[in-house]
Amino acid sequence: MNDLLTRRLLTMGAAAAMLAAVLLLTPITVPAGYPGAVAPATAACPDAEVVFARGRFEPPGIGTVGNAFVSALRSKVNKNVGVYAVKYPADNQIDVGANDMSAHIQSMANSCPNTRLVPGGYSLGAAVTDVVLAVPTQMWGFTNPLPPGSDEHIAAVALFGNGSQWVGPITNFSPAYNDRTIELCHGDDPVCHPADPNTWEANWPQHLAGAYVSSGMVNQAADFVAGKLQ
């Protein structure tokens, strides 16, 4: 197997293992009652906002999958859809991304309470989203968990190539989002589809961002989220 590909797969596997450990050690909770008063929405607040974490090694922004997803979603809803690119190195630092995503969701919930939020991510960015939505306590570098009631501001969740699939759907660990989460794995993508390591190299192209776009899965996710924003 190609050395670079091997390192990437092992790194993604390690990240998935760490995430799995966090999820399995975290008690399942269902959020309730957002504390305190919230500010009224302003004209600067969009109807909806996608809060997206890009995949590993992608340049700053929301990445190939994120851009395609936002573009497709905007074409399907007659609403002002904003976008926030989660700020993190997109290497191995899931906790950095999770802290930033959580902080932004909390900020929007307070400053734009009527804005419907759509957190999501691709590959490592999906792992970032997993931590934010499924881990209600501080652990392993994640220091800014969502307060109870935050789920009231989240309309839908869109995840692509999510490594947590090795231990089960993320909705097993965050049941509050069960009916508003779409989690997609392309074919035999080795990151989200448990498989024999001997097949990883052959199946690696199925994890690439372009595969999720060209297969129609990004459009499928946009259809799902559009339905939740109606």
Curated annotation (Swiss-Prot):
One of its GO terms (molecular function) is carboxylesterase activity. Residues 1-43 form the signal peptide. The active site is at residues 123, 189, 207. Keywords: Disulfide bond, Hydrolase, Secreted, Serine esterase, Signal, Virulence. It comes from the Bacteria. Its main location: secreted. Its EC number is 3.1.1.-. GO terms for cellular component: cell surface; extracellular region. SMART domains: Cutinase. It holds the Pfam family Cutinase. Disulfide bonds join 45-112, 185-192. One of its GO terms (biological process) is symbiont-mediated evasion of host immune response. It is found in: Secreted; Cell surface. The keyword Secreted applies. Five Rv2301 high activity binding peptides (HABPs) could be included as components of an antituberculosis vaccine. The keyword Acyltransferase does not apply. Belongs to the cutinase family. Shows weak esterase activity with the p-nitrophenol-linked aliphatic ester pNP-butyrate. Does not exhibit cutinase activity. This is Probable carboxylesterase Culp2. It comes from Mycobacterium tuberculosis (strain ATCC 25618 / H37Rv).
